[in-house]
Amino acid sequence: MSKAELKDFTFKSRHIGPTNEDEALMLQHLGYENAEEFISSVIPNEIFDSENNGVSIPDGCDQNKALTEINIISKKNVEHRSLIGLGYHSTVIPPVIQRNVLENPNWYTAYTPYQAEISQGRLEALFNFQTLISELTGLPISNASLLDEATAAAEAISLSLTVRKNKNANKFLVDQEILPQTLDVLKTRCEPLGISLEMFDNNNFEIDKNVFGILIQLPGKNGRIWDPTKIINDAHKCNAIVTIAIDPLAQVLIKPMGEFGADIVVGSAQRFGVPIAFGGPHAAFFATKEIYKRQIPGRIVGQSVDVEGNQALRLALQTREQHIRRDKATSNICTAQVLLAVLSSFYAVHHGPKGLKQIAENVVKYRSNFESILMNLEYPIEKYSAFDSVDVYCSEASEVIQLASEEGYNLRVLPIGSDFENAKGFGVTFDELTCDEEIYKLHQILAQVKGKKTHDLSNFIFENASLIDIPLREKSWLEQSVFNQYQSETDLMRYIHCLVSKDFSLVQGMIPLGSCTMKLNAAAELLPIEWREFSSIHPFAPHTQLTGFHEIINDLENWLSALTGFQGVSLQPNAGSQGEFAGLLVIRSWHQSLGEGHRNICLIPTSAHGTNPASAVMSGFKVVSVKCDEYGNVDLEDLKNKSKIHSKNLAALMVTYPSTHGVFEPNIREMCQVIHQEGGQVYLDGANLNAQVGICRPGSYGIDVCHLNLHKTFSIPHGGGGPGVGPIAVADHLVPYLPGHSIIKCGGQKAISAVSAAPFGSAGILPISWMYIRMMGSDGLRKASSIAILSANYLAKRLDPYYPVLFKDPNGLVAHECILDLRPLKSQLGIEVEDVAKRLMDYGFHAPTISWPVAGTLMVEPTESESLPELDRFCDAMIGIREEIEQIKLGKIDPINNPLKQSPHTLKTVTSDDWDRPYSRKEAAYPLPDQEKYKFWPSVSRINNAYGDRNLICSCPSVQDLEDINSV
């Protein structure tokens, strides 16, 4: 066998689905002799980087080499036991959950559950999460997660502003004990909207009618807890909305905040079984009153019924969201933290209410006994009721912190943000991992600093303690069966498997969602995130302990800069929506630095992602729409006209490239020039960057700032709806304005304040993208983009005779995705795009993106990871559906009672004793021949969406209890 005939076993060949032979066949099908000729026909010549010039990315390598390299890097982190607290706590992820959820591609490769009939498993897990949060907080409405606690608090301000009774009120009061990173994000979110933030002391609380809301932190950053009843009542007398940021483990013991009268309760579920991971990702929560259900941000899982009357779950009240309401949306949140919420929900299922209470009581016990030890050693402490933390201000603080570090413990440096050399005090926060031996060790450290003899604590009796100064939980909670019947590992393992078997993920087949880039998430990429050297690190740990993380971050920033043609990158935004927000704020700050803060017009094409206008409004801009022409391109004349009209106030153009219509617009460079001539900046939505990596670089054709979706282009899994990472890359003149942080130094010299709670966002999953880029290398990344474009064009060519491709470039080609026009089917035969989407489930596929960016269409994106047989299987499915439609057209199939209108077909339906449909069971269930070997079954029939919104149920009782009720 010659060298040329040897199989390529590099990672590149593992990641890219089509073989070289497949690639040649696809090129031949399209009429091209080689890939270079094809790509040069797709990419406009003026932006095509034909030689991959200037991209300084290492050559690709195999998985073992990359794992060895990143393992060496991980060892550069110093793994100390963190007692820092401040919203980040050590916890134990039960192995049954780690093995069966976190490490299970059935869970982490799924997409947001828009196609509910094939998403019932994670919808139930999220329904359990919402039930948990509602039970914790005492509020009836909870969402299915937000990005972090700071973002959730900021969203609470937005809701409070929206529903305020005094529309002239513009002040928001914040507890002075708020977590500093939360305050940082609140400042970022409030300033563009003209909201005045003022701090308050709960011992000296004053409020007036110019205040539309207040935020209380319980416990405070020092661990203190207190009864908020009077302040809540005083706030309500002035019609102010009350938000409480609560520690969920403390809330296990304390009377639910909703019973105190809180209107909104937010927090982070990180303590419920999710590693610290250098700041994230973690699932935040947001609960509120029934009256605000249509203003709540993020996604809500609600109960409905399918066409057969069976209970089913779905995403409810979607008309609130950015993909529908655009600049009028309640929030710009798109990606949230579904996988992390699922982990936390199973953590609660695993422990049950008794187990959670035991963990919380242990924290209180250890904190109380540690306080006694401090007093016995004559450390000066302020006596107050606290949940998990003790702050000590003393002259020996630096010595205590240093000695603790030498013994493997990180304490909180006071004041927060100081170096230990300048410490005025130290703080200790206890958590689920605290044990007797840890208290003994801390006692030895503290006694040594005081020069006192260490007493033998081996016989020390740890006295139980309870919280004081605040009412405790009295009513039973989490009585739903799901939280009380799976404490056995066998039962929990089976329950987890039962749920995930209802879900369609990349394990079952291609997910051809346009604008979503559902590519392979390789196992080797995911392995490092569970290593303790990455997963246990606190985001505010000493700089000297973080060398490994800083190397990962520096590598990624340099690689992403090289790939995009920009000069600076911030990894802080923890979702694409937050990347948009950060990028626009950077532009806004740059204008302000030039004395042009009046520039507030943001031009956005009508085809843009819904997050674009929502983010623009959040950033303080006014949105002006730009038309698109009949070919799907931005109307250049309309762009010029709008730019001239608004020239004095023009701030930015937001554009997606390739366009959301699936084509490389030939005049992108001219569009940038038009905006620059009028003093504006150009923002690129990087959702479609998978068609550009290694082929063209936005920074080289006129873009000023763009965000990148690491959970799309750079292989971080979607997790069923998060986590995501949305870094921004900027041109040289914008580098000084990259986001900073109040505790950890990062960002530019003139940095905007933080957009995420952690300084580097969801840093715990950055090793995934590091591994992807390291293994693919420059050539592999370029090849991936080329194959992604080739696969989309192959699908478009095969399907065009059956479903016209709506937009093509002058060469008849598309970018990495294409839009199939189904509108004639509705006008002629009453076939809805939803009918085709649901019928695809019977064929064994997740539907493409439906009715976006054009109503009545399907947007298809295959990615480079899908093999030619899988592409052909999808084409066969779509052609098979078209043939069924033809049978309806010819009158051979009933226009209502047919496989499309009745889809999807469940196993229960096709095995029922009653079958009165004019088509066979086989036609319903096995439309393709190979499906008899393997079949993925939807677990429910088509869901009644309207019923679910009219009869909103988004928390307890659990699904099992509801089934029990209905069976009576």
Curated annotation (Swiss-Prot):
InterPro entries: GcvP, GDC-P_C, GDC-P_N, GDC_P, PyrdxlP-dep_Trfase, PyrdxlP-dep_Trfase_major, PyrdxlP-dep_Trfase_small. GO terms for cellular component: cytosol; glycine cleavage complex. Keywords: Oxidoreductase, Pyridoxal phosphate. Pfam families: GcvP2_C, GDC-P. The modification N6-(pyridoxal phosphate)lysine is found at residue 712. It catalyses: N(6)-[(R)-lipoyl]-L-lysyl-[glycine-cleavage complex H protein] + glycine + H(+) = N(6)-[(R)-S(8)-aminomethyldihydrolipoyl]-L-lysyl-[glycine-cleavage complex H protein] + CO2. It is an enzyme of class 1 (oxidoreductase). GO terms for molecular function: glycine binding; glycine dehydrogenase (decarboxylating) activity; pyridoxal phosphate binding. GO terms for biological process: glycine decarboxylation via glycine cleavage system. Gene3D superfamilies: Aspartate Aminotransferase, domain 1 (3.90.1150.10), Type I PLP-dependent aspartate aminotransferase-like (Major domain) (3.40.640.10). Its EC number is 1.4.4.2. Its cofactor is pyridoxal 5'-phosphate. The keyword Oxidoreductase applies. The glycine cleavage system is composed of four proteins: P, T, L and H. The glycine cleavage system catalyzes the degradation of glycine. The P protein binds the alpha-amino group of glycine through its pyridoxal phosphate cofactor; CO(2) is released and the remaining methylamine moiety is then transferred to the lipoamide cofactor of the H protein. Belongs to the GcvP family. This is Glycine dehydrogenase (decarboxylating).
